[in-house]
Amino acid sequence: MQLVFDELYAASVKGQRFCNLVELIKRPENIKLAYRNIRKNSGSRTAGVDNKTISDLNKWNENALVAHVQRKLDWYVPNAVRRVEIPKDNGKTRPLGIPTIMDRLIQQCILQVLEPICEAKFFKRSNGFRPNHSAENAIAQAERMIQNVGCHYVIDIDIKSFFDNVNHGKLLKQMWTLGIRDKKLLSIISAMLKAEVAGIGFPEKGTPQGGIISPLLSNIVLNELDWWIVSQWEEMPTQRNYVHRIYANGTPDKSSTIRTLRNYTNLKECYVVRYADDFKIFCKKRSDAVKLFEATKQWLLDRLGLEISPEKSKIVNLKRHYSEFLGFKLKVRTKGKKPDGQPRYVVEAHIKDKALQKIREKSKEIIGQIRQTYDPGMEYRLIQKYNSYVMGVHNYYSIATHVNIDFHKIAFDVKKSLYNRLKHRLQKKGQITNRYIKEKYGTSREVRYLNGHAIVPIAYVQHRVPMDKKSRVNKYTPEGRVEIHKNLAGINMAVLYHLMNNPCGKQSVEYNDNRIALYVAQKGKCAVSGVELEAKQVDCHHKKPLVLGGNDSYQNLIIVSDVVHILIHSSNERTIRKYLKVLNLDKKQLAKLNKLRVMAEMQELVF
């Protein structure tokens, strides 16, 4: 299907219209890919109103499942959505709509076809819920606007209950404008939007948070806002068409156009950075910010039917006050002078106060759980949970310029809790068996050990510069995928945290420790196929099985994908042929597979 997705993206870039998308969605290859994608999603274990999860889909015959999805798409009527209230930091709750697992599979089928079309139309500084975009990219873009461009006034706009107030008719018209002209597909999406919410009724507006396709639909709604703001300055046409040179990273140099707009127009210089429904507009002058604030508020109401929250929306002078964005708070401070004698301003980024308090409370909560257990297995799992949490917040917040200072504010309180609750069991000396922890925290004097297991110090963190996405990185072009693989030299931290948080309950501590060490050593890839593994695909295989006298030592374990693991142990010819077809191994990979089969005293595969 990758070739099909690439063609959809290329056609969308050229402005073509798409009138027969349902047939692509119904293709067996697309349905099978959708099944694989939701199977490795942890949310697939959450049941809808029918109480069914991914384990129920796993029981279906492959051809029967494909045929069932195709029939449902012919006359699609969605099941009711289960409503769950998720607590927010402010004490309120956020409604979450969970479709049935079959409806989620159908949404995934649609998402895979719509995403390349929409990606070609989305603005480059829209970062939420998009492939190869992240919160780090959004922070990097915001800091560039503040520090490099010199926009020291920021418009903070909070849309009131955005996901609950999306106009269905307007959304479908926006999809039509993007080139999605398949009326049958639009009617299916309309049915999804109007699906009954169990216990409440049929919604007249809003996109249900929790649906697989909802993030894409929300981006389609706000994409019009992005391009309206961009049209006010960055994409304003000039009388002369300037030839833009291309930088090494693929970004065009628009300095000539910008210089012309600054010198010969009275336009308001502004730049937008958005992550989902959280967006900021950066300006150089307060007078421009005031006018843009009112214009944006009115535009949202007139064009999208959305209101802003007056108490949360404001204009911030970054020289005096902080502006909060994605868990950070940003400000500018003076640092020396420019060659012309003017003060030089640099960004100062801290962790948001509420986020820092939440980190303190969560860390102390896990320490309390460690204190309450004396079972070695449970103790190990809780230490892994604590380490995983601390490493996760370090990884996310390390792009704050003052991250070390911020973590030191809570370090005393967290360490005090650690010593008071575990003081008789803590040791200063020990051996770090986790390779990643050893590389990142091994030089710290604050590392402590509990029954031989290292506990990560909460204040041992260094700032790293946030990186923006390279313009060439693209999931839907061959060149873009090459760039993606270049950036994957390291390991997937999300998978590492998952493995640390979810040790195999029936296995030994040695096994679980070596499982993490091997994942890091193999750079998150399957030892046979070389494919980078998602969390649910990671299997740790005993080269010499325990029943044959094997053990849990590092040398006797290896990380493989779940499908490869099945092939190592399977003696069923039908199963073997099925999964060999899925993997499409070459001779070298097949030799590695056979080597592991022989060690497990299984017959070599000859095909």
PLM regions: where:
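Polybasic, low-complexity binding patches
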Residues: V547-Q555, L567-F607
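Short cysteine-rich loop/turn motifs with clustered Cys
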Residues: S508-D539, S561-V563
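Non-catalytic, peripheral interaction segments enriched in hydrophobic/basic residues
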Residues: R371, M378-Y441
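Histidine-centered nuclease catalytic patch
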Residues: D158, G530-D562, S570-I576
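A conserved non-catalytic segment of reverse transcriptases
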Residues: K194, G199, L304-D375, V390-M391
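Extended C-terminal regions of large enzymes
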Residues: I410-D413, S417-K506
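Conserved polymerase palm-domain catalytic core
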Residues: L65, A80, K124-R125, R130-H133, ...
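Non-catalytic, polymerase-adjacent accessory regions of viral genome-replication enzymes
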Residues: M1-N63
